[in-house]
Amino acid sequence: MKLTCVLIVAVLFLTACQLIAADDSRDLKRFSRRNMRDGMLNTKNTKRQCLPPLSLCNMADDDCCNDCVLFLCSYY
């Protein structure tokens, strides 16, 4: 009975730690889905042509290397 309680508390503690870590890493720009996808696609044979900042863009084509904000490529 004691072992079962200890295991339940340990699982709940580890689950809470995972949820806390997931919430903290969500807002980091260096781990965004777009950057992860670009990292997988950028090999020696694939080169991506990026639009310059403040160029017109849309969400479907995604030619901006950063983000498309209000139909304009952003800086950073």
UniProtKB/Swiss-Prot annotation:
Molecular function terms, GO-annotated: ion channel inhibitor activity; toxin activity
Main location: secreted
Cross-referenced Pfam families: Conotoxin
Annotated InterPro entries: Conotoxin (IPR004214)
UniProt tissue specificity: Expressed by the venom duct.
Keywords: Cleavage on pair of basic residues, Disulfide bond, Knottin, Neurotoxin, Pyrrolidone carboxylic acid, Secreted, Signal, Toxin
Coiled coil: none
Annotated family: Belongs to the conotoxin O1 superfamily.
Record remark: domains: The presence of a 'disulfide through disulfide knot' structurally defines this protein as a knottin.
Protein name per UniProt: Conotoxin ArMKLT2-0211
Species the sequence originates in: Conus arenatus (Sand-dusted cone)
